[in-house]
Amino acid sequence: MAIERTFSIIKPDAVAKNHIGAIYNRFETAGLKIIASKMIHLSKEQAEGFYAEHSERPFFGALVAFMTSGPIMVQTLEGENAVLAHREILGATNPAEAAEGTIRADFAESIDENAAHGSDSVASAEREVAYFFSAEELCPRTR
């Protein structure tokens, strides 16, 4: 099995509802280690930069507005097949389609306010981690 890193965001809706601890518990219970974490309030420029690949999509403005509406938690997770493991814990993007017991089924209200983000590939994870964390901020856990 491959040890990977992935990037995760707990979005403003879930932060506002105090779900941070419950979501972190899901990560750790699944064997993912949190090796970097911080709470930030994205600026419009930061949100537009992070979601630049969606800039031509009709939902881009609403996405940026939502992601800047309150603080978020950003974290880097490490573990076996971390990208896939994290996406399985999150569940389907639309919480109405998410499997029971997943983060989005349990904590999200709608497809627009769906509680969390997870990298969709190792390449995306590397780019997304680097967007928010310097190498010095990553703390691999060896114990």
From Swiss-Prot:
One family name in Pfam for this protein:
NDK
Q: Which UniProt keywords apply?
A: ATP-binding, Cytoplasm, Kinase, Magnesium, Metal-binding, Nucleotide metabolism, Nucleotide-binding, Phosphoprotein, Transferase
So where does ATP get bound?
Answer: 11, 59, 87, 93, 104, 114
Q: Which domain of life is it from?
A: Bacteria
Q: Name one GO cellular component term.
A: cytoplasm
Q: Which GO terms describe its biological process?
A: CTP biosynthetic process; GTP biosynthetic process; UTP biosynthetic process
Oligomeric and partner information: Homotetramer.
Know the name of this protein? Answer: Nucleoside diphosphate kinase
